[in-house]
């Protein structure tokens, strides 16, 4: 019987599900927003929120817990060139989480992500959704207006 089991299985084995959720959260940390199915977004949301909570702790132990959850255990620095590159990308995700994301959520007590429903996918009618950080603004410029160089060039013709 499956009484009181809250984990969404998503039609996968436990190892496959954990790897998929870790990859989804890594993509969310790297790209600030991820388009996926509604079920996967709902399953990845608590994982992402726990990672930010650990990131706010900013301890060595928290960093190791995040790395253990988000990294593939077989990747090492001593493997092939592809494995070393994958390990460095995973390490970048941990760095981004602890140095950029977690400090921006220092004043917020939970609720770091939002799920925006998109509608159905054309091929199989699966509900799609965007999983993104609450403070993420899609078309925001990277630097404030007026701080850049002048918009007109010296020799421009009219």
Report each predicted region and the residues it spans:
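Structured, basic alpha/beta domains of bacterial-type, RNA-associated proteins
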Residues: 1-19, 23-158
